[in-house]
Amino acid sequence: MISPVVLWPALAWLTIIPLAVANGALRQFVLAPRFGIRTAQPISGGLLMVAIAAVAWLLVGRLGSRHMQVWIAIGAAWFVATVAFEFGMGATSGKSWAEMLAPYRFTDNNIWPLVLVWVACAPAVLALVRRPTIP
């Protein structure tokens, strides 16, 4: 049987994928045509960070009070999974290294690197917000 400390964070991360895809579609088809890419990028990044916070909030409620090391490990796992997913999808779709690395630069107001920092920090931050007595 899979431990809840492994299962629930993995399922939570998997729910972030469709949220991120929907966010990308919103940016490409609604925000960018209306506001331009330089405005759409930070709006989209902020919306994705809010969605990730909501998922982390629900995860903290599901797993309850755990040691801070658990929340830090969950954030690290989410970070590694996200970067691996991004590069895996890029490689399978035939993108070059330059194309895959482009989102990791702050160009056209892109805040993807900040989103990745938030992916890593969100479980611990939301654990502290939701359960301030975590050891």
Task: Mark where each language-model region is.
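Membrane-water interface at the C-terminal end of transmembrane alpha helices
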Residues: 114-135
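Transmembrane alpha-helical segments of integral membrane proteins
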Residues: 55-57, 85-100
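Hydrophobic alpha-helical transmembrane segments
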Residues: 6-10, 14, 42-46, 71-76, ...
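Internal alpha-helical transmembrane segments of multi-pass membrane proteins
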Residues: 37-42, 64-80
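N-terminal signal-anchor transmembrane alpha-helix
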Residues: 1-32
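Core segments of alpha-helical transmembrane spans in multipass integral membrane proteins
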Residues: 19-20, 39-61, 78, 114
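Individual transmembrane alpha-helices with interfacial aromatic-anchor signatures
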Residues: 102-119
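Membrane-interface helix termini and inter-helical loops of multi-pass transporters
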Residues: 26-35, 94-104
